[in-house]
């Protein structure tokens, strides 16, 4: 099945010129890898967070958002994840895309120039129109108000 395609303008900043554009690892990947646009390697110590530049500016079309998410391998193997996951990039943001990483392991982790540090998805965002009501007549569900572990372990 062919996926819908949209054009998104992207600009490489001077410190990101030699890095690849965000790209899909496989034909069916949902997210595109983002690369660390660092001049020098940095050490991300346990429980430390750092804002890592990607060297790109993107113009997300109106009606879409960018979602910055962790890479599963970094999280599973090294405890490195995106702190505000998913990080939202609004369609009117025109600054450099940066990734807020945190080290949840007990070992320091070195981030080098060109490392794949996160992934980005460009997803549709509908405009919500709230219908403010006095009484809620929605049909009952099996879950109702259950949350925070109510559906089992």
Swiss-Prot record:
Signal peptide: none annotated. The keyword Transport does not apply. It comes from the Bacteria. GO terms for molecular function: dUTP diphosphatase activity; magnesium ion binding. It catalyses: dUTP + H2O = dUMP + diphosphate + H(+). GO terms for biological process: dUMP biosynthetic process; dUTP catabolic process. Substrate binds at residues 71-73, 84, 88-90, 98. The keyword Magnesium applies. Pfam families: dUTPase (PF00692). Its EC number is 3.6.1.23. Belongs to the dUTPase family. This enzyme is involved in nucleotide metabolism: it produces dUMP, the immediate precursor of thymidine nucleotides and it decreases the intracellular concentration of dUTP so that uracil cannot be incorporated into DNA. This is Deoxyuridine 5'-triphosphate nucleotidohydrolase.
């Amino acid at each position: 099945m062919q996926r819908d395609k949209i054009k998104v303008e992207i600009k490489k900043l001077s410190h990101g010129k030699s890095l690849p554009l965000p790209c899909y690892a496989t034909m069916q990947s949902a997210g595109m890898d983002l690369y660390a646009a660092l001049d020098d390697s940095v050490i991300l110590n346990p429980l430390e967070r750092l804002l890592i530049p990607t060297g790109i500016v993107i113009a997300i079309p109106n009606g879409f958002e960018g979602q910055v998410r962790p890479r599963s391998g970094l999280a599973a193997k090294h405890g490195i994840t995106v702190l505000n996951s998913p990080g939202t990039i609004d369609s009117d943001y025109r600054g450099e895309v940066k990734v807020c990483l945190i080290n949840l392991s007990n070992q320091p982790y070195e981030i080098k120039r060109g490392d794949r540090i996160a992934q980005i998805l460009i997803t549709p965002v509908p405009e919500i129109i709230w219908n403010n009501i006095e009484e809620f007549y929605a049909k009952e569900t099996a879950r109702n108000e259950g949350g925070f572990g109510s559906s089992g372990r």
